[in-house]
């Protein structure tokens, strides 16, 4: 399938620079601190209104009218609503699939954030913190989440594939990006121990993720992985017969 699509950023995963009004009255720079900086009822109201208005069925119709055939939808690790104080958004993704299938579009689900963050970026959920790979319980949670997404959507006509993890940061890029100076952590104590993800760990995680997802996704659905900003290191990865339709 030749992909000609658009990314629906800032709908289900917030990015302050795209919707600064959501952050009015707070010092929060990312989605982790937003609900901790507002009364719960105010936070919930802002999020629910944003999600209902930012992307609608009309957008899918417009995307189709432009001759595109796919949308990439970033989703957060709390999509199923099981990570308080965040509000889940599985209903919105369900709607997106209904709209996509109505207008003959394909969806790439992109797991954009994980607990503890995979990169320390503001769009990774919490600025200046990158500890996900060092927290076994968070890694296991992520595998379980990917399996749940694959089980729910794996056989949907509108699914192009699932991206395992957005922009994990590996050794070469950690220093180049100067993460903790570019994205200042709010809580220095929480940020202690942050660091890049090794390629060895990332390869192992991708293989584990492929296997749990493929149990629920037929081979015509793609498993997509990010190169960690180090494209050359993946030349011979997943070349074995076991791995089908990997992007």
Q: Which ranges hold each PLM region?
A:
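Short, solvent-exposed loop/turn segments at secondary-structure junctions
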Residues: 79-82, 232-233
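Active-site region of glycoside hydrolase catalytic domains
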Residues: 2-5, 16, 28, 117-247
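A cross-domain feature marking catalytic cores of carbohydrate-active enzymes
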Residues: 6-10, 73-77, 109-113, 163-166, ...
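N-terminal carbohydrate-binding accessory modules
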Residues: 1-68
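An active-site-proximal structural segment forming one wall of the substrate-binding cleft
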Residues: 44-71, 81, 85-113, 123-164, ...
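A short alpha-helix capping/helix-coil boundary motif
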Residues: 37-40, 73-77, 128-129, 188-190
């Amino acid at each position: 399938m030749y992909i000609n699509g658009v990314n629906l950023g800032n709908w289900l995963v917030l990015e302050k620079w795209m919707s600064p009004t959501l952050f009015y009255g707070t010092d929060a720079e990312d989605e982790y601190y937003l609900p901790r900086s507002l009364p719960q009822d105010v936070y919930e109201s802002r999020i629910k209104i944003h999600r209902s208005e930012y992307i609608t069925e009309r957008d899918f119709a417009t995307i189709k009218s432009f001759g595109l055939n796919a949308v990439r939808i970033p989703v957060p690790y709390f999509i199923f609503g099981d990570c308080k104080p965040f509000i889940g958004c599985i209903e919105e993704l369900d709607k997106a699939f209904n709209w996509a299938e109505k207008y003959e579009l394909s969806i790439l689900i992109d797991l954009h954030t994980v607990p503890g963050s995979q990169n320390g970026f503001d769009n990774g959920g919490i600025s200046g913190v990158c500890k996900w790979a060092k927290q076994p319980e968070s890694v296991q949670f992520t595998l379980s989440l990917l399996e749940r997404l694959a089980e729910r959507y794996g056989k949907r006509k509108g699914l192009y594939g699932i991206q395992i993890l957005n922009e994990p940061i590996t050794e070469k890029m950690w220093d180049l990006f100067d993460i903790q100076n570019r994205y200042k952590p709010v809580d220095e104590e929480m940020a202690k121990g942050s660091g890049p993800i090794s390629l060895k760990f990332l390869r192992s995680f991708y293989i584990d993720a492929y296997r749990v997802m493929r149990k629920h996704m037929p081979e015509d659905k793609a498993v997509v992985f990010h190169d960690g900003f180090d494209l050359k290191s993946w030349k011979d990865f997943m070349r074995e017969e076991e791995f089908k339709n990997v992007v």
